[in-house]
Structure formats: C-alpha cells, structure tokens
C-alpha cells in the first residue's frame, strides 16, 4: 500500500513536495517488490525515478554542500561519466540503475554503470576498496584525491560498492567485479566492526596517529580527523545494521552461474547445490 501511495504522489498526481525521492533507496526496494510480486508497475516506478534524476525542470532545494551533486541530481544517470557527490547515495542509485539496465536490457544505462564503476575503481577508490575521501558531504572529490589520515571511506560506502559490483556480475562473468567484492569485503567492510562484534567504525581511515589526531602535522593547524577507536553507537548508526545485512548475504556472493557454467566468485569454504 505504501508503494502504491508513493506511485500516486510522485508519478500519477504529482503531489510530492519534490521530484526525486532524495536518498536513493526506494529504487532498490521497488526492484525487490517487483521480483516478489510480479507487479510491473513497481519496476516501472523504479525506472521512472532513475529517469527523473537530473532531468527535472523545476530547481531543487539545496544547501551549499547538500547540492545537486550530493543528491545525485546534477545530470541524467545515462550521461554520468564520473562518480560524484555523496558516496553511498551515488552507489545505491547506480545499484538500482544496474538492476534496471539488466531487467530492461538497456544498453545505454549499462554503459553508464560501467563508466561509473571504472571512475571509482581506477581513480577514486582507496586500496582497501573504500570510497569517499571527504567528510564534507561524505563525498567523492576529484581523481586521485585519496589522503590516508583524513580518509572518510564510510563502511556503508564499501558495502554499497560490493552491492554494485554484485549487480554488474549479472551482465556476464567478469573477474573485475568479483575482485572488487573480495577487496571491499576483507578490507573496507570488515574493518568497520570490532572482533567482538560490538563496536564499529563509521569512517575507516588508512592511517591513525593518536598523538596528532585533529592536527595537521605539516601546518600544526587544527583539522577534522576520523575517530581513532570503534564505538558502539553513532548519531547516524547506519553502518552497524548494514554490516549485519552484508554478512548475512555473503553466501550469495560465492557462486555465479549461467545456462552452462558455475563460476566461483569468492574463494572460501562452501558447498553448493
């Protein structure tokens, strides 16, 4: 019923206060709802939201840093060439774009997804698979801007990159995508949780020096640095449940298959049938 209400507000009656639904998540939910119910209007609504991004005639309501780039609304998805804006938002949006491209056999959208993937892994990703180098807007910045001590590299960003790579594998066996899942799983995601499973990193810096935390060692000027210890709760505790969701999904990442072949995408103790 709620999905039907969203369809009515955003697509049929146009009574919603804004054109695109903000943080990209509803698109992924609509794809799953379509698969669960077979109701085509849900996948059509997901496609509608993808098509509307960057295509709105009316200006959005933004702040200085929470702007069109932050909201993935600066350019149509099919024209996207680089990874921009809020890292997790961008990746969730492109997860849905990959789903839509696969279901509709949309080659233009698939090509945009490939460009986006290449932009991240070749120029805007840490060696750990972490993404997003700035705390301002939790965002991508420019090519090769990947400082270690101030790395944002949100745990959710690594998870969403693994989710995106998993979807890109649907287009055909390509080890680039399974390799990225492996890299993020062991380095960018599991770094976000303590061994006892009780404490978490929201950000995952590649270098921590407690003696100089929040101080630029070159200029001695105070700067913002990530926390140095994992904690149990954040003001925005999106990462802990996301880690739990990812861990529960690992078994589905091990194998891939088509009509004639079974592919081993992740090397770990497992059995398949």
Locate predicted features.
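Glycan-recognition and catalytic cores of secretory/periplasmic carbohydrate-active enzymes
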Residues: 1-273
């Amino acid at each position: 019923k709620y999905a039907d209400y969203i369809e009515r507000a955003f697509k049929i009656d146009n009574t919603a206060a804004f054109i695109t639904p903000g943080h990209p998540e509803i698109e992924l939910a609509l794809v799953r709802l379509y698969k669960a119910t077979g109701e085509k209007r849900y996948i059509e609504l997901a496609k509608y939201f993808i098509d509307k991004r960057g295509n709105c005639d009316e200006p959005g309501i933004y702040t200085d840093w929470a702007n069109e780039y932050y909201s993935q609304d600066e350019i149509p998805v099919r024209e996207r060439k680089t990874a921009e804006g809020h890292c997790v938002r961008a990746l969730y949006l492109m997860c849905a774009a990959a789903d839509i491209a696969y279901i509709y056999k949309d080659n233009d959208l698939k090509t945009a997804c490939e460009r986006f993937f290449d932009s991240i892994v070749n120029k805007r990703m840490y060696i750990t698979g972490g993404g997003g180098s700035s705390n301002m807007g939790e965002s991508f910045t420019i090519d090769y801007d990947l400082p270690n001590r101030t790395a944002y590299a949100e745990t959710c960003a690594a998870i969403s990159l693994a989710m995106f790579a998993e979807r890109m594998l649907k287009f055909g066996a390509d080890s680039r995508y399974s390799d990225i899942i492996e890299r993020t799983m062991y380095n960018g995601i599991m770094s976000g949780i303590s061994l006892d499973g009780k404490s978490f990193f929201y950000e995952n810096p590649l270098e921590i020096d407690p003696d100089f935390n929040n101080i630029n060692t070159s200029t001695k000027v105070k700067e913002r640095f990530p926390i140095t210890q994992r904690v149990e709760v954040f003001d925005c505790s999106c990462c802990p449940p996301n880690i739990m969701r990812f861990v529960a999904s690992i078994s589905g990442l091990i194998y891939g298959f088509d009509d004639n072949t079974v592919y081993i995408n992740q090397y770990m103790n497992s059995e398949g049938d």
